Amino acid sequence: MKKIGNGIKDKLSVIILSYALDDDIYNLNKQAIESLLASETWPSGRLQILLIESNKENPYQYPYPNVDVLIPNEKFGFHRFFNIGIEHTDGEYIAFCNNDIIFHKGWFSAIREVADNRQRFLCFSPIDDSGNYPKMTPEALPRDKAYYRGWEHQKHFAPWCFVWKREVFDITGPFDETVDFYGADCDEQNMMSRNALWSVVCTKSVVNHLAGQTAIVKQSGKGDKYRITDYDKYPLTEFEKTHNYPLWIYDDYRFYEGYQKLKKKWGLDNTNKWLQRKITQYPILNFRPLTRLLFTKRMNHIFCRLRGIKP
């Protein structure tokens, strides 16, 4: 990916991934778009919506302002389509979104307020206030603070909707297209932590996730089609079974393969999360030359040995 710079100032580009196989998914897309349009009073030219459709025979139209539908010739890849979206948009801010979400009033203004007051922050997430995510409840994230920083999954980082400034990709490079839907969120967390980019969750910004309603999730873990039954073929160490991976990955071998691919790239996920917590606890450690050294597979193996864990 070429150097992409900062984009048009104050403009938000929203990239929504869709696989509209039926009217249910189409209506889900419409609900997301309509809630987005109603969530703010958008100044002219300051909102761009790009829906990237995987159904190459897509029969659906979206009669809304600022909405473009792109049907790539390429085979679907979660990160591949996000990279295509980056190339086809021009906003200073880019929101990477599932289609099973509902935007609440003022969600982007709340992110902008934090971004304007803390210009060193480049990566943001809204909260989900439905109660479905325990780490985002008022008890876990008291609302008396406008933001919290860290990299914890479904706490500081909401993979269903996250907003990064365009300049992030001049620091990190593009999304890794060898990483697909299965495990992409862990790869994105490591992208941020390796490059000393805090993931900042904004407590006044609300985007609720209607979990499990996308086409790709509906087809995952159903019946025996993807379920792992040969455990010798898909082994986990005892440590991984108890500390590293949720055992529901056995419901779908594609999740297993995705996490194993990340293990080859980043090392043991549990140790990376341990390191992310340490840096969150001691933020003086969060500077780029150090984090780029720490978040490597070689250092991951060293930390594993120091922790008494077999990598």
Question: Where are the language model's segments positioned?
Answer:
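Short beta-strand/loop segment that forms part of the nucleotide-sugar
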Residues: S44-K56, L70-P72
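Conserved donor NDP-sugar-binding/catalytic core segment of glycosyltransferases
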Residues: I102-E139
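A short, conserved alpha-helix in the catalytic core of glycosyltransferases
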Residues: C161-F162, V168-T172, T178-V206
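Active-site-adjacent helix/loop segment of glycosyltransferases
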Residues: N190-P311
